[in-house]
Amino acid sequence: MFPAKGPSLGAGRARMLTARLLVGSAGMSLLRFTFLGTSAAQPTIHRNLSGLAVKADAELLLFDCGEGSQRQMIRYGTGFSVDAVFFTHFHADHYLGIIGFLRTLGMMGREHGLTLYGPAPAKRLLRQAVHLGVEAVGFPLEILELQDKDRVARPGYTVRAVGVQHRINALGYVLEEDERAGRFNLEAARALGVREGPDFGRLQRGEAVVALSGKTVQPGDVVGPARPGRRLVLSGDTRPCEAMVAAARDADVLIHEATFSDDEQQRALETRHSTAREAGRVARSAGARRLILTHLSSRHDTDPSRLLAQARAEYTGPLEVAHDGMSVEVPLRD
């Protein structure tokens, strides 16, 4: 059994925060993420500090923004049209890159607003960061604090905060696509005399139509059951915990920190991080469909093979160790 979650977050009631956008409900076509940084605590020649860029259809999100993230965005071609930034916690290696990033956005002439999300004390720390580059930040900036179970609704998907176990107040995140419409049975629609064209679209939107015969055709006559959306889960910095197991249940991808190896177990306990074996155990317990390890100690910078082997001892599904620039597209579920 894993501990439930960290002591720093009160249970509270879940809140739904709706982004100031037209929020749709038809899911997404594209879900792709790119690792901007995969190193723990300090950068190396090969690995930058924590950062993940997620492309969700037309939207671009950042999860953490370690020092040097904006250069990585240039290097890996993610673009700078970021719609929101989500911070897992406020250790320096996860957020100091926001200072230069905001300044660059201002110098690029950005005019539309940007929202920064994170656990308390997000407002205090991020305001301080903004002030360091204030002479060039000329666009609306909103800072919102999240807690366990809070949800942020965005077009076609929701981002949910998960309270985890770290040395300070920390969150993991679940990006969950809205349910997608069931499959449209073209042959059944034609057999029922449904007019091709707009009536097909109405049925797919859940509206009844009148067939050529005069009979009313219900959506359930030609549209299959709704299909579950994709789920991308990011642990952030954490000890293995039941909250992350629950969050990653049947996830398409679980990105879990794996700072240490087995022989560094005591260090993992002291610093409130996970070993690769523990990350594998979380993925197995959750039934995650794919596990990607990240946030590696510099000791494993160029040769993460031990981490991979130790995670493999616990988890038999698709397994990789992330590297900077690694880009993954999450396929649609059947």
Segments from the language model and where they lie:
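Active-site metal-binding motif and surrounding structural segment of the metallo-beta-lactamase
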Residues: 67-117, 145
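A short helix->loop->beta-strand "cap" motif at the edges of active sites that frequently abuts
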Residues: 110-114, 286-290, 317
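Residue-identity detector for glycine
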Residues: 6, 10-12, 24-27
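Short, electropositive alpha-helical surface patch
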Residues: 229, 303-324
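Metal-dependent phosphodiesterase/nuclease catalytic metal-binding core
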Residues: 53, 147-293, 304-309, 331-334
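Active-site neighborhood of phospho(di)ester-bond hydrolases with catalytic His/Asp-centered motifs
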Residues: 63-66, 83-90, 119, 233-238, ...
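Conserved beta-strand hairpin/beta-sheet module of binuclear metal-dependent hydrolase folds
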Residues: 28-78, 113, 173-175, 182, ...
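Active-site neighborhood of divalent metal-dependent phosphoester bond hydrolases
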Residues: 110-145, 299
